[in-house]
């Protein structure tokens, strides 16, 4: 009798090409995404060893981290950024890798362009030299971030040694309140259990809520599995997945697509499959979530107060709270609603998709942003930008007083020309609120696109639900 397997175990086991005694299994890698920041050293390693790429056709490159979203002009980038971008252009040409370069209609953030081109498919193994590669697990892919030396190894061999992870099931019951989204769900989850709860695990999100989510919403959830401590976040593919993939450039076509769908339907955890850990959440109780500190677990509901030191028994947690509040210039027991905001950033691989922009536009339509707020709307890809413009979303944003940008990582990280100044407070739809993440001395408050749009209007942290008739 065949042993019942989880989704993760099925995909992992199907890709083991060799497993020696007392050795880590070697996995075949189906898809490799690369960008300008973590690929130069890997290409250099290949050149020094006089190697070619094993499967350049299974590699897709894009320019995203360093690019200026103001102009897409290479000359607008810093010297280091310019060098990284031109190096990627040269390397992809030399090794025969498809590059979504500056001016390409499909250029964008690596974790957005992969799915929208059909490069990401259910049941594949997919890696990238970026920690948020778990995003692609929303398709039932086994996707994880790797280091630069591993990037080189995949280029050379199309394989990787990987220890098998433990499995965790997170079942989401119920439905969201109006004004609550998957960004709020993942922030709530991290706040409840901490940033280390998922360490050593491959997470599978399932349940009533998950089945009803769009692919965009599923990607937001899997994207931040890494902030929960997990290496992998997965969702079993279904008809919503298949419909999203159908017709995309790299997706199977015609009868072949139907054959793949039959296989993809088998990519779900078997009845009776054993997980090493499980969590069950009633999502109907979740309210819009806002981060107040300097790690993604320091999060509260919009109507809650910042914790007091007495709320924590652990000395390290107490110190973490005090250090965070000192940095962000907030107080214990302070109400988060009403805290002044300087910049609003709507974008990133977490929330830079068309659905995210629609949510923000619904709130901003017919309204003006606060006179003291600078608001950046940065589509995650040029395809998202075009689709948004076809719907007239760009006009809504511009009329509201926002800056409508080109595609890129932008203010998610202080690596390009979109940075906050020291002491400036950013309402951000990105995934990390570390010290200086958005610029030296910058202060980040993580939230959903709806909450960020509401903050842009009021100039303070506020409840988005007042703009949704709640």
Curated annotation (Swiss-Prot):
It comes from the Bacteria. The keyword Amino-acid biosynthesis applies. [4Fe-4S] cluster binds at residues 349, 409, 412. Heterodimer of LeuC and LeuD. CDD domains: IPMI (cd01583). Gene3D superfamilies: Aconitase, domain 3. Its cofactor is [4Fe-4S] cluster. PANTHER family: 3-ISOPROPYLMALATE DEHYDRATASE, HOMOACONITASE, MITOCHONDRIAL-RELATED. The keyword Iron applies. Pfam families: Aconitase. Belongs to the aconitase/IPM isomerase family. LeuC type 1 subfamily. Keywords: 4Fe-4S, Amino-acid biosynthesis, Branched-chain amino acid biosynthesis, Iron, Iron-sulfur, Leucine biosynthesis, Lyase, Metal-binding. One of its GO terms (biological process) is L-leucine biosynthetic process. Catalyzes the isomerization between 2-isopropylmalate and 3-isopropylmalate, via the formation of 2-isopropylmaleate. It is an enzyme of class 4 (lyase). It catalyses: (2R,3S)-3-isopropylmalate = (2S)-2-isopropylmalate. It comes from Campylobacter jejuni subsp. jejuni serotype O:2 (strain ATCC 700819 / NCTC 11168). InterPro entries: 3-IsopropMal_deHydase_lsu (IPR004430), Acnase/IPM_dHydase_lsu_aba_1/3 (IPR015931), Acoase/IPM_deHydtase_lsu_aba (IPR001030), Aconitase_4Fe-4S_BS (IPR018136), Aconitase_4Fe-4S_dom (IPR036008), IPM_dehydratase_rel_enz (IPR050067), IPMI_cat (IPR033941). Pathway: Amino-acid biosynthesis; L-leucine biosynthesis; L-leucine from 3-methyl-2-oxobutanoate: step 2/4. One of its GO terms (molecular function) is 4 iron, 4 sulfur cluster binding. This is 3-isopropylmalate dehydratase large subunit. Binds 1 [4Fe-4S] cluster per subunit. Its EC number is 4.2.1.33. SUPFAM superfamilies: Aconitase iron-sulfur domain.
